[in-house]
Design a protein with these regions (language model features):
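A general structural signal for well-ordered alpha-helical segments in protein cores
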Residues: 27, 40, 59, 63, ...
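Short glycine/serine- and small hydrophobic-enriched flexible loop segments
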Residues: 64-71, 120-121
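Short, well-structured N-terminal submotif of metal-dependent ribonuclease cores
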Residues: 1-54, 69-78
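Acidic catalytic patch
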Residues: 79-106, 117
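Alpha-helix capping/helix-boundary segments
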Residues: 29-30, 58, 98, 115, ...
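Residue-level detector of anion-binding/catalytic polar loops
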Residues: 90, 109, 123-125
Length: 146
């Protein structure tokens, strides 16, 4: 009797239907991309293929960066802001009390704590060029339970 080995098959949907892992991005990450800061290529490499999330304060923060650049005569900031607005980033409402508690716990600004809070809520990694926020995220996200 001859026993044949079964063939293993995997059927996959087209790429646009595949789940993209979530990633919380802060203003430093987005600014690096859209204003072509020296670290933009690193930021792009880290976020490609990810589903991007941010607290809704991101809009005001990126607008603030653009305004500062425009006041310094950096006219390219207008295009960068338009690019930021056009990006697919899921914006989330904050839990102000939870954000304030994280800000106190890790000695962060409320703005930075908002990104940390969202990463914890989504159980997702946080992308930032801010060393203090990154360290708080390393500590806090490691304490989360599945």
């Amino acid at each position: 009797m001859i026993v044949s080995t079964p063939t293993f098959h995997v059927a996959e949907p087209p790429a646009q239907y595949l789940h993209r892992p979530p990633l919380v991005v802060d203003c430093s990450t987005l600014a690096g991309l859209v204003f072509r800061e020296p670290w933009w290529a690193d930021a792009l490499a880290r976020i490609e293929g990810r589903e991007l999330h941010a607290p809704n304060i991101l809009q005001a923060e990126i607008a603030n960066v653009a305004v500062k650049k425009l006041r310094r005569g950096e006219t390219h900031a207008t295009e960068g802001l338009a690019q930021a607005v056009a990006m697919e980033i899921d914006l989330h409402r904050l839990d102000a009390e939870a954000v304030a508690a994280l800000a106190q716990r890790y000695n962060l600004s409320a703005s930075d704590a908002a990104y940390l809070w969202l990463a914890a809520e989504l159980k997702a990694p946080l992308a930032t060029f801010d060393a203090k926020l990154a360290e708080a995220a390393r500590v806090h996200l490691a304490t989360l339970r599945g």
